[in-house]
Amino acid sequence: MQMGPDRLQTAIHHRDLFMPLSFHKMDANGDDCVVVDARNSANPVTSALARRMGDRNRGIGFNQLAVVLDCEDADARLMFWNTDGSPLDVCGSATRGAADRLMRESNSKSITLRTHRGLLTCRRTSNGNISVSMGPPLFGWSDVPLAQEMDTLVLPLDGDPAACSMGNPHCTYFVDDVTAIDIAAIGPTLETHPLFPLRTNVHFVQVIDRKHIRLRIWERWGGIPLGSGSCSCGTAVNGIRRGLLDDTVEVECDGGRVTVRWDGVGAVFLIGPVEAVFSGTVADSLLKD
């Protein structure tokens, strides 16, 4: 018995309505992220859903969430969320995770992703790492943003940090011994300093040599992570601006190492590993408000 056009459309509608949200839990040097494929689901990812998914006791748990959506001028569009349900413009680790999944799906070695930072080109390197063109850094005081006009190369704070934006704010302190810094004690105060109206990521970096730095992070909204792609980029960029680093830098975080390249003019390139941990579908209980 054949199904009429109206009944067929109704069946398709109901199929799409109840199509589950699939996800992949990814590990990017200890910076765990979740990639959700929302292209074939009628269940939108909202701030409340992102917060429930980010709960490490009752949800999936992540540092950042990347939601994959259809896009007309790129292979896909990405939206990012923090654990607390707040949106963010960029996440280097989650971008690598999404790029890895999409390149495996399409059996390709490069893709282009649309984000609030613009179009990001991602490639798989010969050793399996993911390279992401993260766009150019921004140095204007209003781009970071800061509360008032000033030189972002040396901020008027104890320790003379530098600031920049990679689509999110970064404040970098250069220290002699990164292990001597009590990040948990001073990180929250620096993150919420009045100079940063949207808060800031805070970096503490020890220059090992011109090609190698040791980095520890207090992440905006997130505390102390094992690693961060955008923070690695912001740190390397500020070190290059200060004349402390060459244009290709190995960034060593607690969870592993990435490479950052910046020629001082154009886009910043982030290169590093990412691995799938497990996959699944979002439970109905999480989808309900």
Regions found by a protein language model. Give the residues of each.
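Short, solvent-exposed secondary-structure boundary/capping segments
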Residues: 128-135
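Active-site-proximal beta-strand elements of phosphoester/diester hydrolases
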Residues: 133, 161-165, 214
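Generic structural detector for well-ordered beta-strands
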Residues: 123, 133, 145, 156, ...
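Internal active-site segments that recognize and position negatively charged phosphoryl groups
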Residues: 153-180
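A glycine-rich beta-to-alpha transition motif near the start of alpha/beta enzyme domains, typified by
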Residues: 11-127, 172-289
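Short, charged beta-turn/beta-strand-edge "cap" motif at the junction between a beta-strand
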Residues: 136-137, 257
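Active-site glycine-rich loop that binds ribose-phosphate moieties when present
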Residues: 138-160
